[in-house]
């Protein structure tokens, strides 16, 4: 596996902001996902907010959610924690904690993830979790692709956008 659940290589993404920058940071990734979600679902009234404080973590630290998506009428919300790892590191120890912490969140949410630095075991854990979604949009993307479909589907189920799941299928 090379960063995507289907084993395909992760597309190269170079930040617009700085031509000297060649690697995406975790903050770059969260901004990219937030921008994608905001643009993709703005016609449905969805608003995406970055770095929102919500209660405490499972170790009693103040929690800051990477992306908070609020539905059109303000009655439903969905939290997205972003994990991007482009090189081998300590992320393997952090993912089980992140999944446990997400379960303790007082609202529905998921972990959006991408990058080539996850071990095969952690990629399997994320791919198997109903609370994680591979997501790697391109800058300015507004349509669903194989690289965004998992997050699109979690948001669609939460907010009741069944047409996102059905796409162009006809009823029986």
List the predicted regions and their residue ranges.
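Well-ordered, non-membrane alpha-helical segments in soluble/globular domains
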Residues: 32, 94-96, 148, 152
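Hydrophobic anchor at the start of a short beta-strand
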Residues: 44, 48-49, 109-110, 133
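Active-site metal-binding core of divalent-cation-utilizing nuclease and nuclease-like domains
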Residues: 44-74, 89
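Acidic-basic catalytic patches of nuclease active cores, encompassing PD-(D/E)XK
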Residues: 1-56
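Phosphate/oxyanion-binding active-site loops and adjacent basic polyanion-contact surfaces
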Residues: 29, 60, 90-94
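Hydrophobic, Leu/Ile/Phe/Ala-enriched alpha-helical segments that form helix-helix packing faces
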Residues: 33-44, 102-105, 126, 158-162, ...
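Non-catalytic C-terminal interaction segments of nucleic acid-processing enzymes
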Residues: 1-6, 70-73, 127-172
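Catalytic cores of nucleic-acid endonucleases
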Residues: 75-78, 83-130
């Amino acid at each position: 596996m090379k960063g995507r659940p289907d084993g395909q290589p992760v597309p190269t993404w170079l930040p617009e902001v700085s031509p000297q920058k060649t690697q995406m940071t975790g903050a770059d990734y969260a901004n990219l996902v937030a921008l994608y979600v905001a643009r993709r679902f703005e016609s449905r009234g969805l608003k995406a907010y970055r770095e929102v404080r919500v209660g405490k973590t499972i170790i009693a630290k103040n929690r800051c959610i990477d992306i908070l998506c609020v539905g059109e009428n303000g009655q439903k919300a969905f939290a997205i924690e972003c994990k991007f790892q482009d090189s081998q590191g300590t992320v393997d120890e952090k993912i089980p904690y992140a999944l446990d912490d997400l379960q303790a969140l007082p609202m529905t949410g998921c972990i959006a993830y991408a990058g080539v630095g996850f071990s095969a075991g952690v990629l399997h854990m994320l791919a198997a979790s109903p609370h994680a979604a591979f997501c790697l949009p391109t800058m300015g993307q507004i349509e669903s692709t194989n690289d965004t479909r998992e997050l699109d589907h979690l948001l669609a189920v939460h907010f009741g956008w069944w047409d996102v799941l059905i796409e162009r299928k006809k009823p029986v």
